[in-house]
């Protein structure tokens, strides 16, 4: 894919994106709990839970902790009553941010995000103030090396009414990836059908895909953005941050 990829900054929880192992585990456990609560607590019949477990295993979350998270989802523990909240904001250089969280206290999370953004000359926006710059889609990503035949992936994805199949290279690792995008309402079915055909994806999730990419050339602004992203990603409530920038 030529030019700057719209997937350049998609986060799928590699070690470099979360400073502490324990913090990564906290985020993975929250996703498992929420996924199990939204459907049957059995990954065979709950595709979102299956994806959450796959992600947890990739991060070496111990099986007993995965099982405990699923079990806790069937209880009524108040501290485990997480809800999915998306916050919108702007950062240095007027970059747009869609911050996906799992929180049990909206007010606390909003206050912490507002403080982090303001520290780097950004601001937390109202609903709709940033989202118009993005398209909300489902993404299923495969390492190119794990797919024997790209045409097969492409044809099956299109048959499933996927919006697109893109080939791109990760900026940091230079690893070639295939990204299947689909409408949000088709996400579960597309993910399940691709799983049946090609087994585990590298990751799959709902993604705020930027309509356009903002190129940041100023080194000082780049440093501020990097510091802000680190601060946001170190917040336990933050699961993903989708953005519309790339560094030049």
UniProtKB/Swiss-Prot annotation:
Keywords: Cytoplasm, DNA-binding, Transcription, Transcription regulation. InterPro entries: Integrase-like_N, TACO1_YebC-like_2nd/3rd_dom, TACO1_YebC_N, Transcrip_reg_TACO1-like, Transcrip_reg_TACO1-like_dom3, YebC-like. It is found in: Cytoplasm. GO terms for molecular function: DNA binding. The keyword Transcription applies. GO terms for cellular component: cytoplasm. GO terms for biological process: regulation of DNA-templated transcription. Residues 1-21 are annotated as: Disordered. Its main location: cytoplasm. It comes from the Bacteria. HAMAP family: Transcrip_reg_TACO1. Belongs to the TACO1 family. PANTHER family: PTHR12532:SF11, TRANSLATIONAL ACTIVATOR OF CYTOCHROME C OXIDASE 1 (PTHR12532). This is Probable transcriptional regulatory protein Ecaj_0351. The lineage of its organism: Bacteria, Pseudomonadati, Pseudomonadota, Alphaproteobacteria, Rickettsiales.
């Amino acid at each position: 894919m030529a030019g700057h990829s719209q997937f350049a900054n998609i986060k799928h929880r590699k070690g470099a994106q979360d400073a502490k192992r324990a913090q990564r585990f906290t985020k993975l456990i929250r996703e498992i709990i929420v996924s199990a609560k939204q459907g049957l607590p059995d990954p065979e019949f709950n595709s979102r839970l299956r994806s959450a477990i796959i992600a947890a295993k990739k991060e070496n979350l111990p099986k007993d902790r995965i099982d405990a998270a699923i079990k806790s989802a069937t209880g009524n523990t108040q501290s485990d009553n997480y809800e999915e909240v998306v916050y919108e904001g702007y950062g240095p250089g007027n970059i747009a941010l869609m911050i996906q969280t799992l929180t049990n206290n909206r007010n606390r999370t909003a206050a912490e995000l507002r403080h982090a953004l303001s520290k780097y000359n950004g601001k937390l926006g109202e609903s709709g103030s940033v989202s118009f710059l993005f398209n909300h889609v489902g993404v299923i990503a495969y390492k190119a090396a794990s797919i024997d035949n790209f045409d097969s992936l492409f044809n099956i994805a299109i048959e499933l009414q996927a919006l697109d199949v893109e080939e791109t290279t990760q900026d940091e690792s230079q690893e070639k990836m295939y990204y299947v995008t689909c409408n949000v309402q088709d996400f579960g079915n597309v993910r399940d059908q691709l799983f049946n055909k090609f087994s585990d994806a590298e990751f799959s999730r709902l993604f705020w895909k930027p309509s356009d990419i903002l190129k940041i050339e100023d080194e000082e602004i780049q440093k501020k953005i990097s510091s802000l992203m680190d601060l946001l990603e170190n917040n336990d409530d933050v699961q993903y941050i989708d953005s519309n920038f790339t560094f030049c």
